[in-house]
From Swiss-Prot:
Record carries keyword Ribonucleoprotein: yes
Name of the molecule in the record: Large ribosomal subunit protein eL39
GO BP field: translation
UniProt keyword annotation of Ribonucleoprotein present: yes
Family stated for the protein in its record: Belongs to the eukaryotic ribosomal protein eL39 family.
GO molecular function terms attached to this record: structural constituent of ribosome
Gene name per UniProt: rpl39e
Region forming the signal peptide: none
Amino acid sequence: MSRNKPLAKKLRMAKANKQNRRIPIWAYAKTNRKLRYRPKPRHWRRNSLKL
């Protein structure tokens, strides 16, 4: 992908990147282990973003 991206697309890609991270340990502990995994896991090669 090109290096020069529109700002709106860049922001959407950044949000998708944040959503793909694991949940923090403190959230796991605070909810008494109810949150166990990422709600929408996405692999960079298998699933494409519909941006």
